[in-house]
């Protein structure tokens, strides 16, 4: 098979809707892209299935997402997770003893609280009889937490589950070198002074060099940013196009923030600091300013920069998921149904960031829907180049036929329906918490805009991906 990264643009549809739409006008200046036009709820079939429980999102919250190294820098992950859980309890008034199970996603684990779901639950005042576990699946960890909750409820094991995610990039674990760790363990086992002196005599200064957390893929030894740069080149996505998309994300996020649309954000009183009330990474700039930045990964000719990449972020999120009959019995008005979902994986070398392209047609087929049925799209924005590459791949018959074994492309999401309240580029991306943010953004947008179906999709390290259909709850 021809390598994706050596396949040139001449083999992609030069006159695709995306090429025309994206290259002919600045994304930041189109009124269509500033917000979706309000529409009446369309009359479509529901995705309810006979003899299968309807599962709903009652509500969801998140702490403000902050640039790492700012107001959350002195906290631990369980502090943020506890804040999200406490915010959810306050928002929903759900009795703690009604919650059957708690699941949190995270990526970079703090050893002291390796099961951060359990520690955060206890810290938030949940019963010690409420089980909790932590999952990890890179950037789709909280997606996995939510779908695990769906499975527990669908199988009848639970009626009420809290799912969420957390990431604290301000204090990542930094270990001693392997040689130093081995020496310290050997010293701990030594029984005599002579044995200890013998071990110490082997010490060398380079043992003190710290072992930093890996930023590259274990299987390929390539950083995600480097992969994004190669992917952008493979799909002939220019630096200007990437900067335009990033500016769009920040502009829409700022607009949504100013209009009070980011209602899932709950204030958090940081111990010893002021109360944090909003995301602090939203930074509408200008294309001229963004163009001044140097490439961040492939130098000097790469196109991925700090401006068109998501930034290191601290934050936590949580959603209350219930069986519909339980929610109604408790007097709740749910926000949305969680419907079909799909996980995919592909080549982590050349297709690391193409999870949405692979997952989208599969979840649509599973749900019996088409792209035209979707009213709201919420895709994770790891990099501008990643988003634009996915959009081009989704709009390419050649890619569908040669890489996905499909007869035709799935099609291009209309930009007027796409990430209209900003995305990970602007709001931030705490690895373990983004999935819940995506679902709540879709649910809240459906309610605001009068749509019925939302599609959530994300890529993840390891060449994995996720997509889910969210259906608006009837008003």
UniProtKB/Swiss-Prot annotation:
The modification N6-acetyllysine is found at residues 73, 189, 294, 299, 333, 349, 362. It comes from the Eukaryota. Keywords: Acetylation, Acyltransferase, Endoplasmic reticulum, Fatty acid metabolism, Lipid metabolism, Membrane, Mitochondrion, Mitochondrion inner membrane, Mitochondrion outer membrane, Transferase, Transit peptide. The keyword NAD does not apply. GO terms for cellular component: endoplasmic reticulum; mitochondrial fatty acid beta-oxidation multienzyme complex; mitochondrial inner membrane; mitochondrial outer membrane. It is found in: Mitochondrion; Mitochondrion inner membrane; Mitochondrion outer membrane; Endoplasmic reticulum. Residues 1-34 form a transit peptide. Residues 174-221 dip into the membrane without crossing it. The active site is at residues 139, 459. It catalyses: an acyl-CoA + acetyl-CoA = a 3-oxoacyl-CoA + CoA; butanoyl-CoA + acetyl-CoA = 3-oxohexanoyl-CoA + CoA; hexanoyl-CoA + acetyl-CoA = 3-oxooctanoyl-CoA + CoA; octanoyl-CoA + acetyl-CoA = 3-oxodecanoyl-CoA + CoA. Its EC number is 2.3.1.155, 2.3.1.16. Signal peptide: none annotated. Pathway: Lipid metabolism; fatty acid beta-oxidation. Transmembrane segments: none annotated. The modification N6-succinyllysine is found at residues 73, 189, 191, 292, 294, 333. GO terms for molecular function: acetyl-CoA C-acetyltransferase activity; acetyl-CoA C-myristoyltransferase activity. The keyword Transferase applies. Pfam families: Thiolase_C, Thiolase_N. The record marks 429 as: Increases nucleophilicity of active site Cys. Belongs to the thiolase-like superfamily. Thiolase family. Heterotetramer of 2 alpha/HADHA and 2 beta/HADHB subunits; forms the mitochondrial trifunctional enzyme. Also purified as higher order heterooligomers including a 4 alpha/HADHA and 4 beta/HADHB heterooligomer which physiological significance remains unclear. The mitochondrial trifunctional enzyme interacts with MTLN. Interacts with RSAD2/viperin. NCBIfam families: AcCoA-C-Actrans. Mitochondrial trifunctional enzyme catalyzes the last three of the four reactions of the mitochondrial beta-oxidation pathway. The mitochondrial beta-oxidation pathway is the major energy-producing process in tissues and is performed through four consecutive reactions breaking down fatty acids into acetyl-CoA. Among the enzymes involved in this pathway, the trifunctional enzyme exhibits specificity for long-chain fatty acids. This is Trifunctional enzyme subunit beta, mitochondrial. It comes from Bos taurus (Bovine).
